[in-house]
Amino acid sequence: MKIYLIWGATCTGKTEHSIKLSKSTGWPVIVLDRVQCCFDIATGSGRPHPEELQSTRRIYLDNRRISEGVISAEEANDRLKLEVNKHIDSGGVILEGGSISLLKLISKDPYWCDRFIWSQHRMRLQDTDVFMDKAKARVRRMLVGSTETTGLLDELVAAQSDLNAKLAIQDIDGYRYIMNYAQARRLSITQLLNVMTGDMKEELINGIALEYYEHAKWQERDFPAEWLAERSTR
């Protein structure tokens, strides 16, 4: 069975690449992102809108609420094995994502070493200006949402009514920045929404984009890059 791995830091175009490959091969995309398993923070976690998928199949390793916490890397790895085995008759699957904890666990698990035919494509982190332009455009779309999608701010407001959700969401990029921004101004999230000015919105967009950039640099440092690069020779 063939596995095509698309990996790289946040905001580098992994989803777009996986959709194109899925359209050309007919293979499903299995997402190696633990946070995207939480359906009630779909926007803030970066899940693509169904229309963006262009009729390709995208599989998450779980379907839970953020109040249940983010799935562990160990459980995600176990579920990944099950999902891959479900699609043996497809001839191949596409793995897409940037969860360092999950990729590190996969790299240490003998299960993944010799039983599959691997190919891989790394989405490289671009220079600061290019990254920030893309990240700010992405955050601008995500922040408020539209008539068809829930915005990141709406997801954050909904989480405030559940202590477990609130505790879990404060560890996630974007949400964490907004919570700290509101706290520094002694505002609740709802109050922040009510007094939001255009300048404040721009401050949030820039701040969240910078938080994404710091996360992306951390990912670049911590990926099991040598093991991942070797997958193209197996």
Curated annotation (Swiss-Prot):
Keyword Zinc-finger: no
One GO MF term: AMP dimethylallyltransferase activity
Gene this chain is encoded by: ptz
Keyword set, alphabetical order: Cytokinin biosynthesis, Plasmid, Transferase
Taxonomic classification: Bacteria, Pseudomonadati, Pseudomonadota, Gammaproteobacteria, Pseudomonadales
The protein's Enzyme Commission number: 2.5.1.27
Purpose: Transfers dimethylallyl groups to AMP as part of the biosynthesis of cytokinin phytohormones.
Catalytic activity annotation: dimethylallyl diphosphate + AMP = N(6)-(dimethylallyl)adenosine 5'-phosphate + diphosphate
Record family assignment: Belongs to the isopentenyl transferase family.
Pfam families, A to Z: IPT
Name the record gives this protein: Adenylate dimethylallyltransferase
An annotated GO BP: cytokinin biosynthetic process
Signal sequence coordinates: none
